[in-house]
Amino acid sequence: MSQNDLNKEKALVVFSGGQDSTTCLFYAKKHFKEVELVTFNYGQRHDKEIEVAKKIAKEQNLKHHILDMSLLSQLTPNALTQHELSIEDNDDGIPNTFVPARNLLFLSFAGALAYQIHAKHIITGVCETDFSGYPDCRDSFIKSMNVTLSLSMDKDFVIHTPLMWLDKAQTWALSDKLGVLDYIRHNTLTCYNGIIGDGCGECPACHLRARGLKHYLEHKGEE
């Protein structure tokens, strides 16, 4: 499908208010005629995530769907839904921030919503390059979900992953190319400890984000 064709289409962005999904929001605004957002409330570590997502959606004048997925917090204790747990890697190398089946469920419900609002395109900010040990962020999983969603609803869905092969520095570069680097830096919430913008500087998410920004700014203009 050509860019001219995409400009006539509708897209649904899986949106958390973090760096990656907000970059996807602006990517979608550039490439699609109509954009809506879906945020999942799954009892995440910080309610502030939902408030940040609402604020950004309002500022960008986009229709924002918030779906209750609180049942996820009942399935397994992990550091994204259980506030009292510290963030660390498990013995199998998968971080205890991993929520089993999260992206499987999120994309399933995003597909159901996309069906209802007549959106062919679903955009998610998952990324395999800065692989954090999450098996449901892999390209192979996304491709399988694309087929499954299309078959389950007899619709020709397209799942877009514009960040899949970008590292964090390249993700910052994309936001700069879209003209929103400063907006994303100061208004998004990536920090596991709930601090907006540059975050706490201590958690794994902040380290990854800060390292990527530093690398991008140091090498900006070299290519």
From Swiss-Prot:
GO biological processes: queuosine biosynthetic process
Binding site for ATP: F15, S16, G17, G18, Q19, D20, S21, T22, T23, C24, L25
E.C. code: 6.3.4.20
UniProt binding sites for Zn(2+): C191, C200, C203, C206
Keywords, ordered alphabetically: ATP-binding, Ligase, Metal-binding, Nucleotide-binding, Queuosine biosynthesis, Zinc
Pathway listed: Purine metabolism; 7-cyano-7-deazaguanine biosynthesis
Catalytic activity: 7-carboxy-7-deazaguanine + NH4(+) + ATP = 7-cyano-7-deazaguanine + ADP + phosphate + H2O + H(+)
Similarity section: Belongs to the QueC family.
HAMAP family named among the record's database cross-references: QueC (MF_01633)
Function statement: Catalyzes the ATP-dependent conversion of 7-carboxy-7-deazaguanine (CDG) to 7-cyano-7-deazaguanine (preQ(0)).
Name the record gives this protein: 7-cyano-7-deazaguanine synthase
Lineage summary: Bacteria, Bacillati, Bacillota, Bacilli, Bacillales
Gene: queC
